[in-house]
Amino acid sequence: MSDQLPDASAQPPDPAQAEPFDPKPVIARLPGLPGVYRYIDSAGNVLYVGKARNLKKRVSSYFNKTQLSPRIAMMVAKIARIDTTVVRTEAEALLLENNLIKALAPRYNILFRDDKSYPFLKLTGHRFPRMAYYRGATDRKHQYFGPFPSAYAVRESMQILQKVFQLRTCEDTVFNNRTRPCLLHQIHRCTGPCVGAISEADYARDVGNAASFLQGRETEVLEGLQSKMEEHAMQLEFEQAAAVRDQIAALSTVLKRQAVEEVGQARDIDVLAVAVEGGRACVNLAMVRGGRHLGDKAYFPAHADEAAMIVEDGDEGAEGGETEPAPAVPLGVERIAARVLSAFMVQHYLDQAPPPIIVVSHVPDDAALLEALALHAGRKIALVRQPQGQRKAWLEMAQQGAALALARRLSEQGSQEARTRALAETIGIDLEDLALLRVECFDISHTAGEATQASCVVFHHHDMQNGEYRRYNIQDITPGDDYAAMRQVLTRRYQKLVELMQEQGGLDPAGEASSPMPHVVLIDGGKGQVEVARQVFEELGLDIGLLVGVAKGEGRKVGLETLVFADGRPSLELGQGSAALMLVAQIRDEAHRFAITGMRARRAKARTTSRLEEIEGVGARRRQKLLTRFGGLRGVMAASIDELASVDGISRGLAEEIYRQLH
């Protein structure tokens, strides 16, 4: 339940005529209820999103200028509008705040970059279940185990299960069409259900044992295997008994290498450790599933130091916000760590279901956090601050991992900032804040003109922003014409930005409040490609000084590249030791990698499905039935007319047409 308050300043003022913002009329209308507030500048950009138990007290605390830190006073000075939403409880406010932070990415909030969903290990619902790596939404048709912190952790578990339980990993289309066992069967990594080498009952027993192992019931699995081995021995089935004995030995070896949670305790645990240094923070998340430590993953928030101080300056006090805010003082490392941990838990666990127990290095400072997580998960969540035994060891490992990851990031950040500065100086860009430097790079990829694809990658805030990468399928050009491909992608990319800038009143493309127009546009190519880019920019009315070509050196050797400028400046050879060239090469190589992977995927898709798609009368369902029945396009091409006609939904006439089209 929410209520958008009326606001006299609901429309962003004209920057040229804006008067100093007067918060008093807005604050006077605010209720003393839970809710979310948003500070917005004169250009309509959201500066900060916060929640409050008492909107009136929280918002008014920011405008007591004698008690604000300099950085927060700078943010308050930019406020031109305040929007608020009233909710029923502080827990609801926390949920709404999280959604808005993720959607709007405000400059002064603690932000964790959205990560793609965590991977799972899947056992399919097939009568001979397949073991597979999986990422995406889950359903009830299959069994899912995880989530795992990384793809490596999933594949490591799959290797263990292959070695111990020998479950199949092949696709169903391959499984349904095999006549001989594959290499995995020969090296004892699969029991060969595809050729009847194991009964359905025995395979189901192996699947059940694998599931029990993943759920942490190792003792139960070992006892069951021991009983099975003795049963085979009693019946003089010594070969089968030896096979089970090998399973027991392999499983025992695995268990000796892993730290396993004590029997009888909760088996699914997350361990969170925070490290803070030099205004940067790292949250290290270690996952324990089924009592087994699956690995960890480091997260680095943006704006941690500034955002923590904003929350402190706007703190409502202990009970319902009755106390006045204390004078601004620098926050200690422990307090910043608690703020960062709260932000991480909200942003992470409202997307990923939390386990029943979370071990933490610091106590989160948000009283509504546990209530919101329990509301979201539908059960209670326990926080453990001072763990004992194995959990204590896991927390110490996570703390050490957080410290090491942060030290590595700070070191990399220093060298990356130096490269950014060198590039800005080389090209002649004057920015007070080098983190704002935005570089976009384009590359064209194809194979002999087939499946031409262009890529655009983005460098911003001293790092590659893979969430902003884009691929463009190039069409209606002469195959292999890289110039036409470059013209098409640049036109498609920047024509939209020009239209957006015109809607915003013709703002300077390099201005802070404008659309995301880059400061530098890198073109992977020499004078010819740069000339095409120059023509496109002139047609669109854009500054050709933004364009820089990266021409390969003699023999295409790395370090001998030349920068080619579209505005008439002489070409520039930077030399192998140039920090600017290192950054240019990094961005250019990433554009090439992104383009070539997309091109290969597109080409593979075209080669495997396009010929069937072109046959009239063969829709998606019939195509899938054909591919499933014959194990792929090659099997369809090898099938006779009678075999094609035997597929459900394929008439004799359609079978003849398919055969004719494929031969």
UniProtKB/Swiss-Prot annotation:
<dbReference type="GO" id="GO:0006289">
    <property type="term" value="P:nucleotide-excision repair"/>
</dbReference>
<dbReference type="InterPro" id="IPR038476">
    <property type="entry name" value="UvrC_RNase_H_dom_sf"/>
</dbReference>
<dbReference type="Pfam" id="PF01541">
    <property type="entry name" value="GIY-YIG"/>
</dbReference>
<dbReference type="InterPro" id="IPR047296">
    <property type="entry name" value="GIY-YIG_UvrC_Cho"/>
</dbReference>
<dbReference type="GO" id="GO:0009432">
    <property type="term" value="P:SOS response"/>
</dbReference>
<feature type="domain" description="UVR">
    <location>
        <begin position="219"/>
        <end position="254"/>
    </location>
</feature>
<dbReference type="GO" id="GO:0009381">
    <property type="term" value="F:excinuclease ABC activity"/>
</dbReference>
<keyword id="KW-0267">Excision nuclease</keyword>
<dbReference type="InterPro" id="IPR000305">
    <property type="entry name" value="GIY-YIG_endonuc"/>
</dbReference>
<dbReference type="GO" id="GO:0009380">
    <property type="term" value="C:excinuclease repair complex"/>
</dbReference>
<feature type="domain" description="GIY-YIG">
    <location>
        <begin position="32"/>
        <end position="110"/>
    </location>
</feature>
<dbReference type="InterPro" id="IPR036876">
    <property type="entry name" value="UVR_dom_sf"/>
</dbReference>
<dbReference type="InterPro" id="IPR001943">
    <property type="entry name" value="UVR_dom"/>
</dbReference>
<dbReference type="Pfam" id="PF14520">
    <property type="entry name" value="HHH_5"/>
</dbReference>
<dbReference type="InterPro" id="IPR050066">
    <property type="entry name" value="UvrABC_protein_C"/>
</dbReference>
<dbReference type="GO" id="GO:0005737">
    <property type="term" value="C:cytoplasm"/>
</dbReference>
<feature type="region of interest" description="Disordered">
    <location>
        <begin position="1"/>
        <end position="24"/>
    </location>
</feature>
<dbReference type="InterPro" id="IPR004791">
    <property type="entry name" value="UvrC"/>
</dbReference>
<dbReference type="InterPro" id="IPR035901">
    <property type="entry name" value="GIY-YIG_endonuc_sf"/>
</dbReference>
<keyword id="KW-0963">Cytoplasm</keyword>
<feature type="compositionally biased region" description="Low complexity">
    <location>
        <begin position="1"/>
        <end position="20"/>
    </location>
</feature>
<keyword id="KW-0228">DNA excision</keyword>
<dbReference type="InterPro" id="IPR010994">
    <property type="entry name" value="RuvA_2-like"/>
</dbReference>
<dbReference type="Pfam" id="PF08459">
    <property type="entry name" value="UvrC_RNaseH_dom"/>
</dbReference>
<protein>
    <recommendedName>
        <fullName>UvrABC system protein C</fullName>
    </recommendedName>
</protein>
<comment type="function">
    <text>The UvrABC repair system catalyzes the recognition and processing of DNA lesions. UvrC both incises the 5' and 3' sides of the lesion. The N-terminal half is responsible for the 3' incision and the C-terminal half is responsible for the 5' incision.</text>
</comment>
<keyword id="KW-0742">SOS response</keyword>
<comment type="subunit">
    <text>Interacts with UvrB in an incision complex.</text>
</comment>
<comment type="similarity">
    <text>Belongs to the UvrC family.</text>
</comment>
<dbReference type="Pfam" id="PF22920">
    <property type="entry name" value="UvrC_RNaseH"/>
</dbReference>
<dbReference type="InterPro" id="IPR001162">
    <property type="entry name" value="UvrC_RNase_H_dom"/>
</dbReference>
<keyword id="KW-0234">DNA repair</keyword>
<dbReference type="Pfam" id="PF02151">
    <property type="entry name" value="UVR"/>
</dbReference>
<dbReference type="GO" id="GO:0003677">
    <property type="term" value="F:DNA binding"/>
</dbReference>
<keyword id="KW-0227">DNA damage</keyword>
